[in-house]
Amino acid sequence: MVQQAESAESESNLPREAMDTEEGEFMACSPVALDESDPDWCKTASGHIKRPMNAFMVWSKIERRKIMEQSPDMHNAEISKRLGKRWKMLKDSEKIPFIREAERLRLKHMADYPDYKYRPRKKPKMDPSAKPNAGQSPEKNAPGGGSKSAKSSGKKCSKLKAAAASPPKPGAKAAPHGDYAGDEYVFGALKVSSKAVKCVFVDEEEEDEEDEDELQLRIKQEADDEEEDEEPGPQQLRRYNVAKVPASPTLSSSAESTEGASLYEEVRGAAGGGRLYYSFKNITKQGPPPPQPPAGLSPASVPLHLHLVGRQRGGGRPPVRPQPQLLAAWPRRRRAGGGAAAGNLSLSLVDKDLDSFSEGSLGSHFEFPDYCTPELSEMIAGDWLEANFSDLVFTY
């Protein structure tokens, strides 16, 4: 029993001794162990303190020397690629001694350089249009030089901000409202402000943010002012919303009619002289209008109104031409001795001849109460086409 215990203790001591020998060999062949006697073992020639090596750096430094001894002509980049692949293929148990060595170096680095703090170099983002000086390179710049370049870039950006925030000159914006010159100015200011945001690297960040907020507020106010200036007037709206009725008659009683009963809405433009415009209103089914006094209707305008009503009533079909006997009855005077009503229309014959048209119509129809008499309204309400199919074919 005692012999078995001694043998077990000897077997348990074997791996420890093996690990100690491996670590001793590693420390002997490690290049870092030879340089630790120097107080400046982790400093460069320029006085820069290097970072402590990690496990991969410790391992790759040893393996790189071996590869360089075997193949001295191999490129450094190729050696690094091979070392990276080999490190990934290593087992975790094989990485343990290098991890321990890296931890030892880290603790020694902390003891030798207690005030060390990792400060990576910040390369200032330069404007692509600005060319760097030939005498200065970003790699050789000291920390003080980097701050100077950042301040100079901040000054340039402040100049750009001032140029963007300044209001435009009165002579610069001479284009009319329809050419969208104001939009180009707003977009240009936004582009300048975006460039300024990209190249700001000064320490006074709060002041820069306040300047940016003021710049955005000014741009927004200018855009609102331009939108108010570019609002279309009533004359511009008439160009798109109204339709002109050609050869419209003189409507003396159009102002006296109500808005609900009228199909068209009269709009007169101030710049158009005496031209008359109409815009469509809601068309609803209504009964026959109440009798109104006849308006002045010239004989030449009645065929035109019948033509228009026929086109709208028939949905694009050819209009019904009035009969010759109706045309002969138009010049007659309805009231005897009326000098002022010389052009009034006597529609008694029209009412008699077109009774057949008004018998079968009880639906909706277009109404012209501004200048239509009840007889003419009943005539318009009638069917314009015969029921026979042969009558639908028109020959010209």
Swiss-Prot record:
Composition bias type Polar residues, residue spans: 1-13, 249-260
Region (Disordered): 1-22, 116-180, 203-261
GO BP terms in the entry: brain development; camera-type eye morphogenesis; negative regulation of transcription by RNA polymerase II; neuron differentiation; positive regulation of canonical Wnt signaling pathway; positive regulation of transcription by RNA polymerase II
Gene Ontology, cellular component aspect: nucleus
SMART domains noted in UniProt: HMG
Domain of life: Eukaryota
UniProt cross-references to InterPro entries, sorted A to Z: HMG_box_dom, HMG_box_dom_sf, SOX-12/11/4, SRY-related_HMG-box_TF-like
Main location: nucleus
Tissue expression: Low level expression is seen in undifferentiated proliferating cells of the neural epithelium. Greater expression is seen in the maturing neurons after they leave the neural epithelium. Also expressed in the embryonic gut epithelium and adrenal medulla.
UniProt keyword terms in alphabetical order: Activator, Developmental protein, Differentiation, DNA-binding, Neurogenesis, Nucleus, Transcription, Transcription regulation
Biased composition (Acidic residues): 203-214, 223-232
Localization: Nucleus
Segments of the chain annotated as binding DNA: 49-117
Biased composition (Low complexity): 160-175
A GO term, aspect molecular function: DNA binding
Pfam family, one: HMG_box
Role description: Transcription factor that acts as a transcriptional activator. May function as a switch in neuronal development.
Descriptive protein name: Transcription factor SOX-11
Gene from which this protein is expressed: SOX11
